[in-house]
Every structure is written in structure tokens, then in C-alpha cells.
């Protein structure tokens, strides 16, 4: 297990949304690159970046910022938001993103998943499955899809994806704790460990994952590290300890 501090970019700034609601925005840093440097100095080796503008419009709008983070830090960058074509995928791969997250496109364009695996390989791809009540949400969490999260995870595993970020929308940005059982179910469907996202409030939430660490690849945290209820150092150490148990 490893920690992925989150940087969500909206209008060029590092923000967090509450439950994915674009009207409930908290700005934490006017410079996402500076925020990435801070996370690196605190011990992070990975970060999870979401282009919120791109998630809403369908076209990444903050690639230049992502490129600067890749170039100016040693962080491995997982990037999502608006990646809905092979051309966009290839562009992000070319600038050095470690992994690209496909979300809405997996539902709206199922053929893209297999084409993406052929283009960049399954290990550089993450299926971003955002769900509310077990149903996958799309278009920046604005729309329901009618697709069950576990069913989509199963399909992506068969398509060749090696990573999944599973986000519980109802918990995201709310610091209400993790739904451990849901992550285990997703890992079973996907047949690979999953990256847990949504609800981390403190180090104790990460510690709760220790008994199921075999099902958890990593943990994304956002608001908790910005507001100080969890430090990056604590999160990195807790992930490492959980893996050893």
C-alpha cells in the first residue's frame, strides 16, 4: 500500500469539492505545482491529479500544469479528468504521466478501454470508477450511468487494466471514513488490488485497511491532508505498516 495525496485542479488552482459538487469548492493552493512540491517534501512518492475542468468538459484543460509537476518533481503522477480519446491518452503518456485514469469513457465508449490497453499497456492505465449507491457516475459525477460498479470493474480486469481507483462519491471530501467492505468487493471483481478513495479523515482510517491490505493497492487522500487531520508523513507510514502486517 502507498499514499496518493490528491490535487484536484479547477480554474488553475488546487481545490477540493464536497461530494463532487462543483458549487461546493474549497481552494487550498493557487499553485498546484507548489502543492505537489509540498507533498513531495513531506514524503509522498505518488500523487493523484484530477483535471476537474476536463472532467466536466470532456477535454483536459490543465495539461501544462501536469507537465510542470512531472518535470519539476520526482513524483509519479496519476492523472484523470477528461481523458476520452486515444490522442489525449498518448499526449499525457508523452509528457511523462505514470498512469492515466479513464472514467466516463469506460461507460460511454467501451471499445476505448481495449484500444487504450493496446496503445499504452494496462499497467499505465487506471479505471476510475466513481459510484454512488453502487452505481457508476459519469461526466464529473453529474450523471448516473445505470452500470453497477462491480460489473464495470470485472469488465476492466478482463480488458487488461491493472489498476482501479474506486471512489465512494457520498464520502468524497466529507472525511467520514472508508467503506472497507466495498473496496474488498471491488478487488474481488477486478481480480487485482484497488486504490481506495473517498472519506479518509485520519490515520486510523488507513489503519483500518491493514486486515484487508492484500485487496488495497493504495489510498488517495485529499481534504484530510489539506486541513491537517492527517499528515502526509503519517499516511505514508501507515500505508507501509499496513502492508507489513
Residue ranges with predicted function:
Residues 2-6, 46, 74-78, 98-101, ...:
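Structural preference for beta-strand elements that scaffold enzyme active sites
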Residues 8, 39, 47, 79, ...:
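Conserved, mostly hydrophobic/aromatic
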Residues 19-23, 93, 97-172:
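Conserved anion-binding
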Residues 46-64, 104, 165-176:
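Glycine-rich, proline-tolerant flexible connector loops at the mouths of alpha/beta enzymes
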Residues 53, 61-120:
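Glycine/small-residue-rich loop that forms an oxyanion/phosphate-binding "nest" at active or ligand-binding sites
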Residues 60-67, 110, 142-151, 176-185:
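Charged helix-capping and loop-helix junction motifs
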Residues 73-100, 181-215, 235:
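Catalytic cores of alpha/beta
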Residues 112-119, 207-221, 225-245:
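C-terminal helical cap(s) of enzyme catalytic domains, especially alpha/beta-barrels
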